[in-house]
Amino acid sequence: MEIFKVIFLGIIQGLTEFLPISSSGHLVLFQELLGINTDQITLDVFLHFGTVIPVLIIFWDDVRDIIFFKKEKRWLTILILVGIIPTGIIGILFEDFFANLFSSVKTVGFMLLVTGFLLYLSEKLSNYNKELKEMQYHNALIVGVAQGMAIIPGISRSGSTIVASLLQGFDRDAAARYSFLLSAPVIFGAGLVELKDALSTGLEQLTWLSIIIGTIFAALSGYFAIKYLLYILRKGKLTVFAYYCWIVGIMIIILAGIF
């Protein structure tokens, strides 16, 4: 794989992993419509690991306290664990089903329309007043289920989790903070699963230079994506991403029908 394609995929992975526009949907889109092969197991592994890095940097205070299970953040650690449970169950039981059922480009387009609708709905109907400390176990479970549904290409992981929090009345900062903290172990876990597959097939597919470059660009683009999304959330302009999802979704459906 040429270096510029590795850089491109790294940037796409970092941006779409955290912006509420569906990373899986865009990867399917670029693979099918632009002829870019994303079926590089080794690269996928390190792109996933690369996107964990900005979460660790931006939310380091929370991450450090969670890792060391500090008493003052024990409540947050438990909420993260509770949220991971339904995500893991859905991923283990239904990943192959959804991957086979919803892997067509046209269906990705329809799912992006759904993502846009949910983003728009959350911005218009939500009553943001709860802080993250007010989150209960059932709230975390609902967010975890929403994250699990993001295995459907075209459904955004960050979008679904943020929407799930907003529709339960949590403020924007709480929704974003919990979404990104919940994403880190899930993304890291997905990377470990892919690493197992890569080890079984061999790691000779790419040079270490390509792997390092792809990881760096995934981390850098992921960092700026998180910062930008936090800015958009605080400005109350989440509908920007809804319009984007609608436009891209309609374009995908039209192009899929033509070709």
UniProtKB/Swiss-Prot annotation:
Stated name of the protein: Undecaprenyl-diphosphatase
Keywords: Antibiotic resistance, Cell inner membrane, Cell membrane, Cell shape, Cell wall biogenesis/degradation, Hydrolase, Membrane, Peptidoglycan synthesis, Transmembrane, Transmembrane helix
Species of provenance: Halothermothrix orenii (strain H 168 / OCM 544 / DSM 9562)
Taxonomic placement: Bacteria, Bacillati, Bacillota, Clostridia, Halanaerobiales
Pfam families, per the entry: BacA
Membrane topology: Multi-pass membrane protein
Superkingdom in the source lineage: Bacteria
Reactions this protein catalyses: di-trans,octa-cis-undecaprenyl diphosphate + H2O = di-trans,octa-cis-undecaprenyl phosphate + phosphate + H(+)
Family in the record: Belongs to the UppP family.
Entry keyword Metal-binding: no
GO cellular component entries: plasma membrane
Enzyme Commission number, as recorded: 3.6.1.27
TM annotation in the entry: 1-21, 40-60, 75-95, 101-121, 179-199, 206-226, 239-259
EC supergroup of this enzyme: hydrolase
Note: Bacitracin is thought to be involved in the inhibition of peptidoglycan synthesis by sequestering undecaprenyl diphosphate, thereby reducing the pool of lipid carrier available.
Subcellular location per the Swiss-Prot or TrEMBL entry: Cell inner membrane
One term of GO molecular function: undecaprenyl-diphosphatase activity
Cell inner membrane found in the keyword field: yes
Function, in words: Catalyzes the dephosphorylation of undecaprenyl diphosphate (UPP). Confers resistance to bacitracin.
Gene: uppP
One of the GO BP terms on file: cell wall organization
